[in-house]
Amino acid sequence: MKQEKLNFTTKLAYGSGDMGPAITANILVFFLLYFFTNVAGLPPGMAGSILAIGKIGDAINDPIAGILSDRTRTKWGRRIPWMLFGTIPFGVFFFLQWLVPTFSSDPNTNNWYLFAYYIVVATLFNLAYTAVNLPYTALTPELTQDYNERTNLNSFRFAFSIGGSILSLILAGFISQAYPNDPLKEYFVLGLSSSLISMIAIFWATFRIQEKGSQPILNQQLRKTFGFILSATGIVFFILGIYRVFNDININLYGVLGILIGLQITLFGITLIFSKTESHLCDAEATLHRQSTQQESSIPIKEQLKIAFRNKPFLYVIGIYLSCWLAVQLTASILIYYVVSCMKMDKAAFPTVAIAVQGTALVMLFVWKYISEKIGKRSVFFIGTVIWIVAQGGLFLLQPGQTRELYLLAGGAGIGVSVAYLIPWSMIPDVIELDELNTGQRREGIFYSFMVLLQKFGLALALFLVGQALEWSGFIEASPGEAIPVQPDTALLAIRIAVAPLPAIILVFGLVIAYFYPITKEVHADIRAKIQAKKQVS
């Protein structure tokens, strides 16, 4: 069996494709609920309902987009066109979520208008997010079928993902310091800058990646031409940013943004200049791969879904993924309340706590990648998740003033969060190949979309219950422009439960499911050998 190794620039560009969704998702999960209750002034029950409705709409979009992307036929392939045309709406609708328009002088009436506005914008953003991110996630098995190379590719992906998450928190910290007494402007600038950086990251992947058996958007000559133009533009932004930073006594926010965007555009350009085309993406076998994928549309949608859910390892991966991301996003959505109200820390300190989680996760990502090659994905998941459960549970016991202990537990949680990024997404291509062995068809979009579908339905319910629990516990929302109120003991207890024991219990269920996951490294090698044998016979 020939090796399907990828060029470094391919891995780099592929990784950047998850940076945009990661930045926006991270900002949303850490700040949006807080923004609704403490900046827009919405009651927590109403705010939680907005998040839940948005996630339900997002979940409904996923299988539709998965099926449509599987059936898309263009010279650029099935996935890349979706990313190309969905990126600008993605950025625009993300930004619109951070505005607080005034519709009425009556606070109650205005709240209901805001409720409708945020639901419409969230629905449109989630539609654009799905159009960009779902085809992107389905690219992994299109780029390589090598077991270890896929883990390596996902390491790049989630390095950018976690790196983007950390970058978004650092950026949020700078912006918070720049506008300490103007939260409306603070979140306006945060939404705008995050949108720009995210769109550049997605376009980076879109214009560099080539799907198997398809043409790239830019040929080698155009890549070099655009690469030099982008590199020169990025260097100008970078120099202007440096100039503004070093000519200001205080931290110059626009200088920092110039440095970040300039560095990003420069790397984008360099990646295009030094790009190489992998032979396994354009040889005769790649052409056969493309022809085989074009036969999938003949299978009725209902039958495709039945085939997907008959794949038992797929159901295990769904359970593992659901447990991990429920824990991650439940914690993230409530963590800012925990830091400000339970630990009595300043809001400006929150990004550093979140960075302690994400920074540890970024470092451990490469450690787990190396270990998984030695002992397998399931064993890595067990080790990381046990550490995560211990750290998560410890948050319940912390009291105001125990800042050092908070950062230590945040780092411990980050060790586990890294396996949530790496392992479930590395398992999905193995499940897809088992389906290919059994059916002779490759349906990446179906598997990826339904994995995320169930996760989003679960998350929608969880976010709704968190919002309702805060309201039932007597949580006091802030009025726009006023100081954050002191919360009653019942609300503080609800926050502690949501940030510690609840995610830990969910993770225990994930461990139980992972114990029964059947595709080991040896089983996967056997699956690949049988697929190869079938291709040689045909």
Predicted regions, residues:
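Membrane-embedded alpha-helical bundles of multi-pass transporters/translocases
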Residues: 1-283, 292-538
